[in-house]
């Protein structure tokens, strides 16, 4: 069932794993996860979050990786080949356009955010960030000026130029190499930030809060919904990015093992962010009362600028954020690049150029509405893509195909629990993510 045509690929197991970690580690880990941990009671939130990471890492991630690898295709080809087992290839391919377009739309919105990050990293580098001091009016005005329509054209174009330059070098030569550098550096620097912040007066209050468990709080259904949503969206199960990276993975490697590592390190990145941000806010005497861009570009800037060594802390922090954003953006755009290569038979550089023009033009135009743009894509299209991938793989392709795809390259067959848990529980979770997100205005 796999394509026999020449296809780019990851050159090593850890290159693949680090790229998948890079795709998963993004803004949700940095500006949403610490806020949710703070808002929902530290360990009271973490316990259900860990349970959902275990569930999704043991089902959805494995399934999407295996779907991509077994078909050697992105979503369009993968969905088509799965549906072809029931004589409905054209229907499957048509459905496959949904996660492809969703990934492109999310990438376009995310480009604006990565452009903000590039600008703030440059400000941290030249001292402009620290020069704002702790004057909240100045800090807020700076961010509002950046996030408005046409307010960040230069840095948005720079961010996309770096992104597409990486992609032009291919999967092994560009994406893998970039992630092999950026991901280890990100973890090392975040750990260093955590160690430094632990030495600051008042940071201990933040740590105590993180590890506080309120059993009564576990009875709140909304806690479980938001913990589930954070795990679901953080692990990048959307029927696109994980499928495409899986299609570049060697048949000789174990998908269950790779999936466990991706889930583990994505969770570790989120925990490191929480262990940096929550104690930092405590040390600065600030309340973590808001998540999203405001946390990162306003409140943390204020806190860092009041710390000893704040200029260096801000620089290191925004470098970490830049790496997290860039590696996620590469993955999001890769889905549509592969689709052009596959459907229009374009050379990689030509496909990258086409998507670069589209991505740059649209992202420049939507800067003023990027928040609403991202909400529509993340609330509706991403969970729909995950649900469609789950249905096509676990329901349409069937048990024999699924187990053969998952077990290929593994040292031992996956347990009997995997197929029913994935088919019934995981697919139900994907449907829940779609419904709950629509009803609550987003859960991840």
Where are these regions (language model features)?
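C-terminal membrane-solvent junction of multi-pass transporters and transport-like membrane proteins
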Residues: 94-103, 337, 343-356, 376-434, ...
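Membrane-interface "cap" regions at the ends of multi-pass membrane proteins
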Residues: 1-31, 60-65, 69-97, 250-254, ...
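Transmembrane helix-boundary motif of multi-pass solute transporters/channels
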Residues: 12-52, 240-241, 246, 253-260, ...
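Transmembrane helix-loop boundary segments of multi-pass membrane transporters
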Residues: 32-49, 68-74, 116, 174-182, ...
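Membrane-embedded translocation segments of transport machinery
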Residues: 2-6, 10, 176, 180-326, ...
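Loop-to-transmembrane helix boundary motifs in multi-pass membrane proteins
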Residues: 9, 15-17, 23, 153-154, ...
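Transmembrane helix-loop junctions in multi-pass membrane proteins
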Residues: 27-36, 40-43, 163-176, 195-208, ...
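Inter-helical loop and helix-membrane interface segments of multi-pass membrane transporters/permeases
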Residues: 4-8, 36-40, 70-98, 111-172, ...
